[in-house]
A protein has these predicted regions:
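A short, exposed loop/beta-hairpin motif centered on an aromatic-Gly-Thr core
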Residues: 26-50, 55, 63
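Short N-terminal "domain-start" leader segments
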Residues: 1-31, 58-66
Length: 66
């Protein structure tokens, strides 16, 4: 999968982990609030992080704690 997003947030939700991803910049300008493209749910944190690393650079991944 090609890296094409620059915003990613992993948050726990009940018994799953939700990965939200999208765009944080537009034509070189940083947006005040990121544009969410989609989200996916995974059963474990390891699977969520593995997916996130495929679609965004590692420094763009933000994790939320319970």
């Amino acid at each position: 999968m090609k890296i094409k997003y620059d915003y990613c947030k992993i948050s726990p939700d009940r018994d799953k982990y939700v990965v939200e991803y999208g765009h944080n910049t537009y034509k070189g300008y940083t947006l005040s609030s990121p544009i969410k493209v989609a989200d996916r749910a995974f059963s474990t944190e390891k699977k969520a992080v593995r997916f996130a690393k495929k679609i965004v650079p590692v420094e763009c991944i933000k994790k939320e704690e319970k």
